[in-house]
Structures are given as structure tokens and as C-alpha cells.
Amino acid sequence: EGVAVNDELTLVIDIGKSHAKLLMVDAQGTVVERHGRANASVPSALGYPALDVQGLEDWMAQTLRASSHTARCRRVITSTHGAALVALGDEGLAWAPVDYEFDGLAQHPLLASAFDAAADGFAYTLSPDLPAGLNAARQLFYVQNLHPEAWRRTRCLLPYAQYWAWR
């Protein structure tokens, strides 16, 4: 027994820096159900601020289990910050996702200089030299150099939006 096409909903997962939302939207664009929660970084086991993946996942699972509309959702659309990414290992997260506003390299001037020397310029990347972790390469360089064991566990990198669609 399926859901009639005109009864189908799209689940929108919108994860912002300070707030996360789950919306269930019908074919006409009407929001049928809306849920939200505060969102903030959490301390990681490696000592840097991390995106709250577990808190968000627990909230989403609880919210979707409690909704009478979940069975009607046939599509998922995710929206997150473009600099957020997740590293997967053989058994889930390889390391907690670095908060993209964390400037880990600023705490290590020699490492920051090494990054600046190694990074390709705008003409090659078409990305300006953004501060903190707003260039994902800064986050990756930070983990590679300060947490090499965590980096070795990395098998795959996913943009944050794709992680939530996959999850």
C-alpha cells in the first residue's frame, strides 16, 4: 500500500550554524509540519569545537518517529554550510567534523605558514583565501598535521549536506 502521489511530502533538512529545522513540504510548497532546535558546536575528543552530529541525529530520529507525516515523505533535500564536511572511516565517523568557524591554524603560526605556502591560489581553485575553516582545505590540513591518527582513519570525505542525505 503506497502513498498517493498528491499526498507525497518532501523532507527538508536545514542545518544552520545556530538553528536546525526539519520541514515537511507538500507538492504545492506548503509546509505541512515544522520542527526546529538550537544548534551549536560541541567539544570534540580531539580538543577542537565540532559540529554536533550526534545531537542532530538523535533529534531528527526522535522527531521523525513522533511525526504522523513521516511515512508520506518520499524525497529528502538537505541544506547546510558549504564549508562543513564529514570524514568517514570504516566504522562511521573517522573524527568529529570540525566547526568551520574554528581557526585551528591560527593557534599554530608555523603550521598556518606551511598551509599558506602549500595552498593553491585563487587562479587555480577559484576560491578566495577565506578565514578560519571556511575553506575546507584549512580544516583538512589542521587534522592531517595535528591529528594524523584520525586522518589515517579517513576513508571518505562528504560535504555536510550529502552526509545528512546519506545518513
How should these model regions be labeled?
Residues 2-96, 153:
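N-terminal glycine/serine-rich phosphate-binding loop of ATP-dependent small-molecule kinases
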Residues 65-167:
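Glycine-rich phosphate-binding/catalytic subdomain of phosphoryl-transfer
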